A protein has these predicted regions:
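Surface-exposed loop and turn segments in beta-propeller and other repeat-based domains
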Residues: 78-94, 137-157, 202-208, 244-257, ...
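Short coil/turn segments that connect the beta-strands within blades of beta-propeller domains
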Residues: 106-108, 167-169, 217-220, 266-268
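Beta-strand-rich domains and repeat architectures in extracellular enzymes and scaffolds
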Residues: 38-76, 92-107
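Short loop/turn segments immediately following the C-termini of beta-strands
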Residues: 67-70, 114-116, 176-178, 183, ...
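Beta-propeller domains
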Residues: 60-92, 118-127, 132-134
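Beta-propeller blade signature
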Residues: 76-77, 125-138, 185-194, 285-302
């Protein structure tokens, strides 16, 4: 009997371990299911409007904003047949390229910077400012500089994405300047537009993209991670961001990063992705043709997000 005792003990240990792993696995599934549900939401009209100077110039609709970095430096407005014409004054080139923009109710445009293939002495300095295109005059200028943002040779990125909060006239802005391949030191800033006061800083997450979403369950800041292929959400309560985000969705391709988030319809999001590794190649020139778009929709009966199509 003693001869078989070690075998019995081994089998007992294996059985207990399997039971523990089973319980851990199922507890994770249940937790993930709860976290993934943002509540029912719809696409809503934005409070932002197009700049008034475009009306003064009698630019016809439709008008598209071009930040592609392929033909124009800075920002350009495209219009006419097949968007073949443009509004792009030389003065709009002075701050190099931009990564994202948002419009406010007056038609002012706020933009975050973007380093390009060729690094110049002025490039790193550009990455710590938010820029404003005046709705009436069309003048492009530095709106606010955050001096603690310090892009450099190891990581040329600084302020990278933003969204406008129609509820309280504020901006949510992300920066990834102090991060590297191993450590996440990103910051999300909440800024009052009227006073330029930083209302809140949340450290420790590299948000490559940000998007506000309001649902029947609450208000969230959706963020696409620069470090992995997942979409996350911060809770917003009393105009304050929660200390840490919760995971919402994971892409099937591990090298893709969510660069842009759009609300397309009922419980429907569109995610634009790029490869990203804290180097310039992911955002420039030839890499434009490997961007992907995914439409994901929350299926309440299956309690999960589903990819509707990819192209």
């Amino acid at each position: 009997m003693r001869r078989y005792l070690p075998i019995f003990v081994s089998l007992l240990i294996v059985s207990i371990s399997a039971l523990i792993l089973f319980n851990i696995k199922h507890s994770r599934v249940n937790a993930s299911t709860t976290v993934n549900d943002l509540g029912e939401f719809e696409k809503k009209l934005t409070c932002g409007r197009q700049p008034l100077f475009l009306t003064k110039l009698r630019i016809p609709q439709p008008i598209a904003v071009d930040l592609s970095q392929q033909q124009y430096r800075g920002v350009a407005f495209l219009f006419g047949p097949n968007l073949s014409q443009s509004v792009h004054p030389k003065s709009w080139k002075r701050f190099d390229h931009f990564s994202s923009y948002i419009l406010d109710p007056k038609g002012n445009m706020y933009l975050t910077p973007m380093p390009y293939i060729t690094i110049e002495p002025k490039t790193f300095g550009f990455q710590k400012s938010i820029y404003k295109l005046n709705s009436n005059s069309g003048k492009l200028s530095v709106w606010m500089t955050i001096d603690e943002v310090t892009a450099g040779t190891n990581n040329p990125f600084g302020l990278i994405s933003l969204d406008y909060d129609c509820d309280d006239n504020t901006l949510w802005v992300s920066a990834i300047d102090k991060s590297d391949y191993t450590t996440s030191r990103g910051i999300i800033y909440h800024i009052d537009v009227a006073t330029k006061k930083i209302l809140q800083k949340v450290d420790g997450f590299d948000a490559l993209s940000v998007k506000l979403l309001k649902s029947k369950k609450g208000k969230y800041l959706l963020v696409g991670s620069a470090r992995d292929n997942r979409l996350y959400a911060y809770d917003i309560k009393n105009s304050k961001l929660s200390s840490s985000p919760k995971e919402i969705f994971e892409l099937t391709n591990s090298v893709e990063r969510i660069r842009k988030i759009d609300i397309m319809g009922k419980n429907l999001l569109r995610l634009e992705t790029i490869p990203f590794s804290y180097s310039l190649i992911a955002e420039t020139g030839e890499e434009q043709n490997i961007r992907e778009n995914y439409n994901i929709q929350w299926n309440s009966s299956k309690i999960k997000w589903e990819i509707l199509k990819s192209k």
